[in-house]
Amino acid sequence: MAISHRGFTITRVPMLADNYAWLVAHGGASAFVDPADAAAAIEAVEAAGGRLDWVLLTHHHDDHIAGAVDLAARFGARIAGNAADAARLPRLDAALAPGQTIDLGGEAVRMIATPGHTVGHVTYLFGDAAAACGDTLFSLGCGRMFEGTPAQFHASLQALAALDPETLMLCGHEYTLSNARFARHVDPDNAALAARAAEAERLRAAGAPTLPVRLADELAANPFLRAASAEEFARLRAAKDKF
């Protein structure tokens, strides 16, 4: 089901076991974020009208890029990604530096660097409506730190925390239930977190998704987003890795 928010139309596209890709439309144009599966992506684009202008890649992991080339070829779309990580991405038609934008139906979509999960990870900002954050931020959690440093990852999360609180966070995986268990372990007295965890349980029991999620809700409940320092973030990330 498509969601309309601040002039953008956002469609969640489930892929693989627990991935979410995202189809975002504005002004008659559309962009597809992180197509792991070309067939599923093509089906979603065709169901939405059959136009695709951009394929946007957040990072180089195969479960986010495997369908990019075939998807772009099917619709004549351009592929955009981080110029600094181009060697690990499919061929880029638009190799972007942090802060650069693409046009989506008259609205600028800005790429920002959000290293931590990988050193080349980026996030795409669709105006003040949505942020396609890949595996940097998850609902009630964050991605594993495969390549970056705690300082890098914490800075990336703080950059996301500074966005408009009504921004919809377009995360790359359905990990909310497992994240909620850890979050409640480290922050047991957080009422907002308890309510979010209960809601996630209800939604998943009904087979419903927990994403997208408002940034404001994450600011109130996500321990990684609330970490006051890189050192606190590092302790949380290490604890989650062993949880």
From Swiss-Prot:
Keywords associated with the record: Hydrolase, Metal-binding, Zinc
Catalytic activity annotation: an S-(2-hydroxyacyl)glutathione + H2O = a 2-hydroxy carboxylate + glutathione + H(+)
InterPro entries tied to this protein: Clx_II_MBL, Glyoxalase_II_hydrolase, HAGH_C, Hydroxyacylglutathione_Hdrlase, Metallo-B-lactamas, RibonucZ/Hydroxyglut_hydro
Keyword Hydrolase annotated: yes
A Pfam entry, by short name: Lactamase_B
Alphabetized CDD domains for the sequence: hydroxyacylglutathione_hydrolase_MBL-fold
Protein's pathway: Secondary metabolite metabolism; methylglyoxal degradation; (R)-lactate from methylglyoxal: step 2/2
HAMAP family given in the database record: Glyoxalase_2
Described function: Thiolesterase that catalyzes the hydrolysis of S-D-lactoyl-glutathione to form glutathione and D-lactic acid.
Name the record gives this protein: Hydroxyacylglutathione hydrolase
